[in-house]
Curated annotation (Swiss-Prot):
Cofactors (names): Ca(2+); heme b
Binding sites annotated in the UniProt record for Ca(2+) 2: T180, D231, T234, D239
Binding residues annotated for substrate, in chain numbering: P148
Protein name: Peroxidase C1C
Glycosylation sites: N22, N66, N195, N207, N223, N264
Lineage of source species: Eukaryota, Viridiplantae, Streptophyta, Embryophyta, Tracheophyta
Length: 332
């Protein structure tokens, strides 16, 4: 079990002010360009950061590909065939490396990218604490154990968040608001629509009109990879409509609606109501929760490394470069 330690003192928003002062602008410009062709990429980048931080802290371990010594977290149940945005992170990292070689970690690149994605989609602007370093391995088993599932009940959600040190109700409710934009696959809601808890009936907490809409998008024998908007009101905008939806029983996945409809929701219902009533209240809570999540067991100082290629640890990256040079020289 991972118990988080928060290290605010080691991370600071000014970390790259001298060594790479334009890093945030570099990241932002690339995301602006990506959004032109893929409006849902902002939500995908935020999700990558979330899934990174929940597994051994925010160390960019989710970005590593398979090696002979470890399996990638990309194969974990919560990531396989759903985590996306890796090529965008590659492009951001390459641009940052051109401007500031061997300076900005992949973990910080992903953290900045998540913040910029939220802001560009209409969400708050804030300076994220920086100074993380990158892990030298991935943690598939930990990803399978730690990542919350769409079918989680509220007690299971609370346990998953507390397990990584996010033990405030506001952590859970505010970070769940990341589902105010983005999409989800039909396969994650089929039980809610047709056979909730093996009853042969839909989830009773699902608004009946919304149920019919979702059944049209996700028919019983249809393609379960079809994508459905998390937020039926403003699907690509980062706002507080997610919470308005929960009040109307229109949360897309079970773990969303649990925040308002679970018998155990006495401490989360008031927060859902508060965020639904005030965008700024939600934004303030979201920024605080994002910074707390961003401070889960960071590698700092001389721990870990600054990866040159976010997909591979440096020894492999350098070996790859050396092999290319040797091949080139031998062909001369």
């Amino acid at each position: 079990m991972l118990h988080a330690s928060f290290s605010n003192a080691q991370l600071t928003p000014t970390f790259y002010d001298n060594s790479c002062p334009n890093v945030s602008n570099i990241v932002r410009d690339i995301i602006i360009n990506e959004l032109r062709s893929d409006p849902s990429i902002a939500a995908s980048i935020l999700r990558l950061h979330f899934h990174d931080c929940f597994v051994n802290g925010c160390d960019a371990s989710i970005l590593l590909d398979n090696t002979t010594s470890f399996r990638t977290e990309k194969d974990a149940f919560g990531n396989a065939n759903s985590a996306r945005g890796f090529p965008v992170v590659d492009r951001i990292k390459a641009a940052v490396e051109r401007a500031c070689p061997r300076t900005v970690s992949c973990a910080d690149v992903l953290t900045i990218a998540a913040q910029q994605s939220v802001n560009l989609a209409g969400g708050p602007s804030w300076r994220v604490p920086l100074g993380r370093r990158d892990s030298r391995q991935a943690f598939l088993d930990l990803a399978n154990a730690n990542l919350p599932a769409p079918s989680f009940t509220l007690p299971e959600l609370k346990a998953a968040f507390a397990n990584v040190g996010l033990n405030r109700p506001s952590d859970l409710v505010a970070l769940s608001g990341g589902h105010t934009f983005g999409k989800n696959q039909c396969r994650f809601i089929m039980d809610r629509l047709y056979n909730f808890s093996n009853t042969g009936l839909p989830d009773p907490t699902l608004n009946t009109t919304y149920l019919q809409t979702l059944r049209q998008q996700c028919p019983r024998n249809g393609n379960q990879s079809v994508l459905v908007d998390f937020d039926l009101r403003t699907p690509t905008v980062f706002d507080n409509k997610y919470y308005v939806n929960l009040k109307e029983q229109k949360g897309l996945i079970q773990s969303d609606q649990e925040l308002f409809s679970s018998p155990n929701a006495t401490d989360t219902i008031p927060l859902v109501r508060s965020y639904a009533d005030g965008t700024q209240t939600f934004f303030n809570a979201f920024v605080e929760a994002m910074n707390r999540m961003g401070n889960i067991t960071p590698l700092t100082g001389t721990q870990g490394e600054i990866r040159l290629n976010c997909r591979v640890v440096n020894s492999n990256s350098l070996l790859h470069d050396i092999v290319e040079v040797v091949d080139f020289v031998s062909s001369m």
